[in-house]
Amino acid sequence: MKIMVVGGGGREHAIIKKLKENQEIEKIYALPGNGGIAADAECVPIGATDLDGIVKFAAENAIDYAVVAPDDPLVMGCVDRLEAIGIPCFGPRANAAIIEGSKVFSKNLMKQYGIPTAAYEVFDDAEKALAYLETAPIPTVIKADGLALGKGVIIADTREKAKAAVISIMQDKQFGKSGDQIVIEEFLEGPEVSVLSFTDGETIVPMISSMDHKRAGDGDTGLNTGGMGTVAPNPYYTDAVAEECMNNIFLPTVKAMKAEGRPFKGCLYFGLMITKDGVKVIEYNCRFGDPETQVVLPLLKSDLFTIMRAVTDGKLSETPVEFSDKYAACVIMASDGYPVKYEKGYEITIPADITDKVFVAGAAKKDGKLLTSGGRVLGVTAIADQLKDAIDSSYAMVDRIHFDNAYWRHDIGKRAMEAK
Ligand code: AMP
Ligand code: GLY
C-alpha cells in the first residue's frame, strides 16, 4: 500500500507518524513534506497547492490512497482531482471544503439550520459596512470571507479600528479576493475549545477535545499565530458540554451539509466558544487543526489508517475510534520574531531519544543538517497520566532541543491547569 500525504507542517508530520503504525502501509510520500518529515516519509518537492503536479505524481507512482491535509488544496479541489483519476482520498471535496473556504457560506449555513453561532451581517460593499459600524456594538469582529492564512479575523475594540479593518480588507484588498465579502459579527466571550471529528457524511465521531494557544506571547498577549501550543483533553469540555455539542452543533452540521448536497467526508474541525448562553461555533475548518493534531493523534489508540479508510468508504459507524484517557501537551518552538519577521537557516539539534516526540514544521535538510526554515519550527509532545506531568515533560524536552533564535511560550497548559 502506497500512501501520499499532501502538506508539509507539524500536522502532516503527526499524521505520518500515526499512519506508520499500520503494517499494511509500505511507503509514505509527503508532498512537499519538510526536512524533519524526511525521517518518516519520502519527501517529494511538489507544493501542496500544485494540483497538476500532485495528480501527475499520484498517477505515475500508483498511489493507493491520499490524505490531503491543508486547507488550500482542499478548497481548490485537490480531492476532486484525485478522485477523478480513481485515487481514494481522506479529505472533503471542494463543495464541502467551502465550510472553511467561505465564512459567508458557513455563517449562512448555521443560520439556516439553527446552529448556534455569533449574530452577524454580511457585506459586499465597504460603504455599507462602514455605515453599519457607526452604530454596531463594540467590540466587534470583522472576518474576511475567504482563506487568509489565519489572519483574516480582526477583533476591534474601538469603532475606528473596526473601520480601519474594513478598509484594509475591502478597499486595500489586504487578503486579495478573500476580502470581496466580509462578515461583521457579535463579539463573544468564554473559554475556547477545539474539537476535531471524523465524519463520513452520515456518522460523526468527535476526537478528544483540545485547547490551542493562538497568541504569540505568554499570558495570551501579542499577535495571533497559527498556534503556539496545545493540550488535550480540554478541561472545559465536560460531558454535558460534549452532549450539547453533539445535539446542537456536530450532528446538525453534518446533516446540514448533506441536505445541501455537500456531504462532508474527512476531518471536520469545530472551533467552539463556551458562552454563558451555551456553546457557539466560532469557526469551522475542513481539516485537522495545527497544532491540535500534535496532541490529538498521539492519544488515538485505534489505527488511524483504518479510520480514514472507513471515512472514505462511508463505514465510520462500524469502526471503533478510541482515545487514551491520558493527557497530552505540545509546546511549539518557533523562530524568534514569528509571526512577523524572523531569521532562518539555524541548525537544529534534537537528542536521539526524543525524536519520536518531535513533530517538525519548518525545517530543511542541508548537507545532512536540519536547519530552521519557517516561523513555527517544531512541536514537542509529551503524554502523561496527569496534565501537569505532560506539560512539565514537554518543557523538559524543549530544554534539550537547540537552535539559535528559538522562541517558545512558557505557559502552555496554564489556563487548562487553572480550570481544574
Ligand atoms: P480564526 O482565525 O477564525 O481561528 O479566529 C481567531 C480567533 O479569533 C479565534 O480563535 C477567537 O479567539 C477569535 N474570535 C473569532 N470570532 C470571534 C467572536 N465572534 N468573538 C470573540 N472572539 C472571536
Ligand atoms: N490551530 C487552529 C487551526 O488549525 O486553524
Feature names for model-found ranges:
Residues 90-151:
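A conserved helix-loop-beta module that forms one wall/lid of the active-site cleft
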Residues 152, 156-293:
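Internal nucleotide-binding/catalytic subdomain
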